[in-house]
From Swiss-Prot:
<keyword id="KW-0349">Heme</keyword>
<dbReference type="GO" id="GO:0005789">
    <property type="term" value="C:endoplasmic reticulum membrane"/>
</dbReference>
<dbReference type="GO" id="GO:0016705">
    <property type="term" value="F:oxidoreductase activity, acting on paired donors, with incorporation or reduction of molecular oxygen"/>
</dbReference>
<feature type="binding site" description="covalent">
    <location>
        <position position="307"/>
    </location>
    <ligand>
        <name>heme</name>
    </ligand>
</feature>
<dbReference type="GO" id="GO:0004497">
    <property type="term" value="F:monooxygenase activity"/>
</dbReference>
<keyword id="KW-0256">Endoplasmic reticulum</keyword>
<comment type="function">
    <text>May be involved in the metabolism of insect hormones and in the breakdown of synthetic insecticides.</text>
</comment>
<dbReference type="GO" id="GO:0005506">
    <property type="term" value="F:iron ion binding"/>
</dbReference>
<comment type="similarity">
    <text>Belongs to the cytochrome P450 family.</text>
</comment>
<dbReference type="InterPro" id="IPR001128">
    <property type="entry name" value="Cyt_P450"/>
</dbReference>
<protein>
    <recommendedName>
        <fullName>Cytochrome P450 4e2</fullName>
        <ecNumber>1.14.-.-</ecNumber>
    </recommendedName>
</protein>
<keyword id="KW-0472">Membrane</keyword>
<dbReference type="InterPro" id="IPR036396">
    <property type="entry name" value="Cyt_P450_sf"/>
</dbReference>
<feature type="binding site" description="axial binding residue">
    <location>
        <position position="444"/>
    </location>
    <ligand>
        <name>heme</name>
    </ligand>
</feature>
<keyword id="KW-0560">Oxidoreductase</keyword>
<dbReference type="InterPro" id="IPR002401">
    <property type="entry name" value="Cyt_P450_E_grp-I"/>
</dbReference>
<dbReference type="GO" id="GO:0020037">
    <property type="term" value="F:heme binding"/>
</dbReference>
Length: 526
């Protein structure tokens, strides 16, 4: 009896000892980095905050505290290095072996499987090579037609939403637009998300994206086995099944259509597309001399839909929000629209070639991505020891590449809190000092697609509307952005009490979002 009691009492101590010993080497090696002091077992988890917004503020605070350089922090027994050094970024992003994603991406596995976002090793290399032609110039032109069609529907919808000088959340509206575009381009189907917001598939996309963001900051729910005990797990399972069934059904029908040599052209058929969809390209591709199986097709289509929807929603939303606050830049953009398209032709779609001629629009989007990058962090996991810029980084470490910090480094970008698109004509950041779409062999394969969609939507909105802030008083009079992201602690705390309820509260998980929405008004141009 006493023996059993001793064992029972000793187990927690043995567990603590095991966990501490298992991290001993990593702790010893990583001690050379600056970083906040933590507690045994807990690390720095208790210091980081209770939600994604507080965590982002904390990480920025540490970045300032440690000289805007790399630093180490611990989440329990998980070691993390926040990376902003250009030499580190160059090594990591150029590496052919350091390509394993961090554990946070495991939250997407049940939905996405091991597609291009989450796979590694030979599978990733083969699939990357196979998928690259899907973003060829000619295919992007086809995709652009789809973007224009859906943007036209979006403009009509916005006219209704914005009527009567209504203040509305643009981020919420953009979600449905980008969902329509991605389903159309990825699978050749129209789900009409802008019109059918309550449909099961539209709601499933929204619920799944929310679920991934929520679980990322819930230690117990991040564990797949423990999450099965959570009260919201049954709802998650239903959402997952809805998405899987939807995608698999379309893939099966598309395979049959390809086998028969024809795709239905009946009016009203939801599977009709005049142009090649991403799925059609995959069905025409081979790996090791064989066609892709159903599982591989599902993984890559689902991955393309997730990456192409969530990141583009962020990019479009923050760009339009910045239009509302920075009226001088908006006037320059409208002037460019008239110069490129002609004063009397602003009501038509911009062609693929015309979008490429909009140089100030390109500068504006670059500056928008500098201050509000769609992907704020990239996580890589070291499966072996690496020597980076003379430092030993031990096996088992997560490298968090702080892309959102790069835009606020005054050594690279003078006066970083001033929104100034022209800076990209005058200031030339190094290849690893500004990487909103990552860089190197594992850069964002769909970055041209994303930029084309953002430019197409922003261009059409500018031609149809004056974009106004939620309240006139919120227009930036000095060119500075309204968020306190990236400011030193003392200055941020001084400004926080004066933040307006319509100023965005930023949160960062896999993509950058505003927790309180992005509120604007629109005034039709005549």
């Amino acid at each position: 009896m006493w023996f059993v009691l001793y064992i029972f009492l000793a187990l927690p101590l043995l567990l603590v000892a095991y966990l501490e010993l298992s991290t001993f080497r990593r702790r010893r090696v990583l001690n050379k980095f600056n970083g906040p002091r933590g507690l045994p077992l807990m690390g720095n988890a208790h210091q980081m905050g209770k939600n994604p917004s507080e965590i982002l503020d904390t990480v920025f605070s540490w970045w300032h505290q440690y000289g805007k350089d790399n630093f180490v922090f611990w989440i329990g027994t998980y070691s993390n290095v926040l990376v902003t050094s250009s030499k580190y970024l160059e090594f990591i992003l150029s590496s052919q072996t350091l390509i394993t994603k961090s554990d946070i991406y495991q939250l997407t596995h049940p939905w996405l499987g091991l597609g291009l976002l989450t796979s590694t090793g030979s599978k990733w290399h083969k699939h990357r090579k196979m998928i690259t032609p899907a973003f060829h110039f000619n295919i992007l032109q086809d995709f652009h037609e789809v973007m224009n069609e859906n943007s036209t529907k979006f403009i009509k919808h916005l006219k209704t939403v914005a009527a009567g000088d209504n203040i509305f959340d643009f981020q919420e509206q953009a979600h449905y637009l980008t969902l329509d575009v991605i389903c159309d381009t990825a699978m050749g189907v129209s789900i009409n998300a802008m019109e059918n917001r309550s449909s099961s598939i539209v709601q499933a996309f929204k619920d799944m994206c929310y679920n991934i963001n929520m679980r990322a900051f819930h230690p117990l729910k991040r564990n797949e086995l423990l999450y099965r005990l959570a009260p919201d797990y049954p709802a998650y399972s239903r959402t997952l099944k809805t998405l899987q069934d939807f995608t698999n059904e379309i893939i099966a029908k598309r395979i049959e259509a390809h086998k028969s040599g024809a795709v239905s052209t009946n009016a009203g058929d939801e599977f009709t597309r005049k142009k090649m969809a991403f799925l059609d390209t995959l069905l025409s591709s081979t790996i090791d001399g064989r066609p892709l199986n159903s599982k591989e097709l599902y993984e890559e289509v689902s991955t393309f839909m997730f990456e192409g929807h969530d990141t583009t929603t962020s990019g479009v939303s923050f760009a339009v929000y910045l239009l509302s606050r920075h009226q001088d830049e908006q006037r320059k953009l409208f002037k460019e629209q008239r110069e490129v398209m002609g004063n009397s032709e602003l009501g038509r779609d911009a062609t693929f070639q015309e979008i490429s001629q909009m140089k100030y629009l390109d500068l504006f989007i670059k500056e928008a991505q500098r201050v509000y990058p769609s992907v704020p962090f990239i996580g890589r996991f070291t499966e072996k020891d690496y020597v980076i810029d003379g430092d030993l980084v031990p096996k088992g470490t997560t490298l968090n590449l702080g892309l959102v910090m790069l835009g606020y480094n005054e050594k690279v970008f003078k006066d970083p809190h001033k929104f100034r698109p022209e800076r990209f004509e005058l200031e030339k950041p190094g290849p690893f000092e500004y990487v909103p779409f990552s860089a190197g062999p594992r850069n964002c394969i769909g970055q041209k697609f994303a930029l084309l969609e953002i430019k197409t939507v922003v261009s059409k909105i500018i031609r149809n509307f004056e974009v106004l802030p939620a309240l006139d008083e919120l227009v930036s009079k000095d060119g500075y952005i309204s968020t306190t992201i990236g400011l030193p602690d003392a200055e941020r705390k001084k400004r926080d009490p004066y933040r307006h309820k319509y100023d965005p509260i930023l949160s960062a998980v896999l993509t950058l979002k505003s927790e309180n929405g992005l509120y604007i008004r629109l005034k039709e141009r005549h």
